[in-house]
């Protein structure tokens, strides 16, 4: 009996030590994430809100259209390939050749997509901006900055992934902090030099992406052995993973900026600046959205099936609580947020709560999407249902809302995000019942 009691005591002690070690590890990761993302978030918020105050309404509208267009193209030239690397590598993160193989496959697809997308994008960019009488030289400079950002963003996306796989959170955030300081400093220099225009701001952003992309590329060398050519089998595996999501990604690329593009087409330059400024308030959710890929995605990918439902509900519940609280505060106390936007936008008191509501719905959807991707709940019917429902609702909104006004564009964004959220909840229920598709299981 004494021997058995002693054995139980040793087992209990070992279990407690293991639990304590895991707790310390996750606490360390969470602390590093909050410190790193907090620093990046604060620096980017400061820069963004300084630009709101420093730039004229016309210059800010021009810069915002270029930024929105670049964000859309970033989705189109990636199609989720970079995000798929974590799921495809799985628990083989210590194998440098495996990580390098999938990075090379992601490059394979990105290079081909860029060569197709850029010529088409040039035509669309000219069409979108044709309503506004802006100089041709300005449009060319803005579009060239978009191309430059796309090229350098590839470095940042590919070579930051090995750091996430190995959960080296500090090394993941260091380059972003450096480039954020770089961007803020250059914007300040341009301001005091009276040279802060739309195109100069756009090129400063491009240079910041180049800085942290180069640092990532150098820092990832010890973690990756990248082949000279992509592996056809890895390409096929990645394509099987991405296939069901490609229609959704293409559609979402346009959806992400549709509010800005609609107000650009239907509204005036001031309306463009207002929608873009209110979009800055959505950055309240940026630190939480980044947590999807840095914390939630790797965590859910490793959760045992028996514990998945509980973890899923816990994460969803926390995200709902955070989003609801921020939304309520924005409606009840809009003045602090208006002060942050600056004196040019103090007339947006009735709009700011709706902007946060739309961002809240989008954030909750991003949490669900991160968990679904981590479990490989990627279905062809999901993309089709998502696209059909949203297009149907948006066509109805075109007839019901006055999209030349800032407030109605915000209503449009909120309704769209709620519809997308409904589809994602359906996907989650189906995933628990049926699991991932056979090709991805």
Predicted regions mapped to residue ranges:
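N-terminal membrane topogenesis motif
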Residues: 1-43, 97-100, 104, 230-245, ...
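Signature of the first transmembrane helix
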Residues: 6, 24-86, 149, 243-270, ...
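Hydrophobic faces of transmembrane alpha-helices in multi-pass small-molecule transporters and flippases
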Residues: 23-46, 107-112, 143-147, 170-177, ...
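Membrane-water interface segments that mark the loop-to-transmembrane alpha-helix transition
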Residues: 24-40, 66, 75-128, 305-327
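Helix-loop junctions and terminal segments of transmembrane helices
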Residues: 78-94, 164-165, 282-306, 373-374
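Interfacial segments at transmembrane-helix termini and the short loops linking adjacent helices
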Residues: 127-145, 269, 332-360
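Hydrophobic alpha-helical transmembrane segments
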Residues: 140-144, 173-222, 385-393, 404-431
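Membrane-interface junctions at transmembrane-helix termini in multi-pass inner-membrane proteins
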Residues: 150-174, 301-305, 357-384
């Amino acid at each position: 009996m004494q021997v058995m009691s002693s054995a139980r005591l040793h087992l209990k002690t070992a279990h407690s030590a293991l639990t304590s070690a895991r707790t310390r590890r996750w606490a360390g990761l969470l602390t590093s994430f909050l410190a790193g993302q907090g620093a990046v978030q604060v620096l980017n918020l400061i820069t963004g809100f300084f630009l709101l105050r420093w730039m004229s309404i016309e210059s800010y509208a021009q810069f915002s259209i270029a930024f929105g267009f670049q964000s859309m193209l970033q989705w189109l030239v990636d199609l989720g390939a970079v995000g798929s690397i974590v799921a495809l590598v799985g628990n083989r993160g210590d194998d440098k050749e495996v990580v390098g193989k999938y990075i090379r496959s992601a490059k394979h697809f990105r290079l081909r997509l860029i060569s197709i997308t850029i010529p088409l994008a040039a035509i669309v960019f000219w069409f979108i901006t044709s309503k506004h009488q802006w100089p041709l030289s300005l449009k060319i400079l803005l579009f060239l900055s978009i191309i430059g950002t796309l090229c350098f963003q590839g470095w940042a996306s590919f070579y930051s992934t090995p750091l996430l796989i190995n959960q080296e959170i500090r090394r993941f955030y260091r380059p972003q902090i450096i480039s954020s300081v770089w961007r803020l400093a250059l914007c300040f220099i341009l301001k005091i030099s009276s040279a802060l225009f739309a195109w100069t701001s756009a090129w400063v952003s491009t240079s910041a992406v180049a800085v942290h992309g180069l640092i990532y590329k150098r820092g990832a060398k010890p973690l990756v052995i990248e082949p000279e050519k992509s592996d056809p089998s890895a390409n096929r595996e990645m394509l099987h993973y991405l296939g069901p999501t490609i229609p959704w990604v293409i559609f979402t690329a346009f959806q992400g900026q549709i509010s800005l593009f609609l107000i650009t087409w239907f509204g005036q330059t001031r309306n463009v600046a207002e929608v873009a400024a209110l979009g800055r308030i959505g950055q309240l959710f940026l630190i939480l959205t980044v947590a999807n890929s840095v914390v939630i995605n790797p965590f859910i990918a490793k959760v045992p099936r028996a514990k998945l439902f509980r973890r899923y509900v816990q994460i969803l519940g926390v995200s709902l609580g955070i989003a609801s609280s921020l939304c309520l505060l924005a409606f009840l106390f809009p003045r602090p947020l208006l002060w942050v936007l600056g004196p040019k936008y103090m007339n947006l008191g009735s709009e700011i709560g709706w902007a946060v509501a739309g961002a809240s719905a989008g954030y909750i959807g991003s949490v669900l999407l991160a968990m679904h991707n981590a479990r490989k709940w990627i279905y062809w019917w999901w993309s089709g249902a998502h696209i059909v429902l949203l297009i149907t609702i948006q066509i109805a909104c075109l007839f019901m809302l006055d999209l030349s006004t800032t407030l109605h564009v915000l209503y449009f964004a909120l309704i769209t995000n709620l519809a997308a959220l409904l589809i994602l909840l359906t996907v989650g229920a189906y995933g628990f019942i049926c699991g991932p598709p056979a090709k991805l299981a």
